[in-house]
């Protein structure tokens, strides 16, 4: 799914163990920000640009990034504290739910972790009022908002020309 391959930092080759500590939260572009999405944080600008510009395969690229040998061989644990869940907007701001009983999610398997984390995110969204999730407070519900926000990211990474040529990012429902 990658035209130019994924560029990972050298430090990943130099380290012995990788422990991911992702949040359990909403994401304006991809719907959720869990463990697998953490791989994006390692990338150089050129890899991020390809990821967002050729958005028709963005979900597949997220999965591909987690199969890079360095990550696959060195990732030991994925650990999330589900005591505060970013239930709208994301990745940096939105409505935070603090459940009465929190949940700590830990797994050696990133897919298993993300399935539990996603279920926890969805469960905590069900208790929200309509006021907390309407309109611009949860833009992921609107296809126009998702594709426009992705073009803004492409513009920031590659410029106006790349933004004009960017593929449409299609949203997938979470709940």
Q: Whereabouts are the PLM-identified features?
A:
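Extended, low-polarity segments enriched in aliphatic/aromatic residues
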Residues: 1-175
């Amino acid at each position: 799914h990658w035209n130019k391959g994924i560029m990972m930092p050298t430090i990943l080759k130099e380290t012995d163990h990788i422990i991911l500590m992702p949040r359990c939260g909403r994401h304006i572009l991809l719907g959720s920000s869990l463990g697998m999405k953490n791989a994006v944080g390692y990338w150089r600008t050129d890899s991020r640009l390809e990821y967002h510009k050729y958005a028709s395969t963005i979900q597949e690229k997220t999965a591909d990034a987690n199969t890079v040998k360095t990550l696959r061989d060195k990732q030991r644990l994925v650990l999330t504290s589900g005591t505060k869940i970013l239930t709208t907007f994301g990745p940096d701001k939105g409505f935070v739910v603090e459940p009465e009983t929190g949940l700590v999610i830990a797994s050696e398997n990133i897919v298993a972790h993300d399935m539990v984390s996603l279920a926890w995110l969805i469960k905590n969204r069900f208790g929200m009022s309509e006021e907390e999730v309407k309109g611009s407070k949860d833009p992921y519900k609107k296809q126009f908002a998702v594709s426009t926000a992705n073009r803004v990211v492409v513009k920031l990474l590659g410029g106006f020309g790349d933004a004009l040529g960017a593929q449409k990012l299609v949203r997938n429902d979470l709940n």
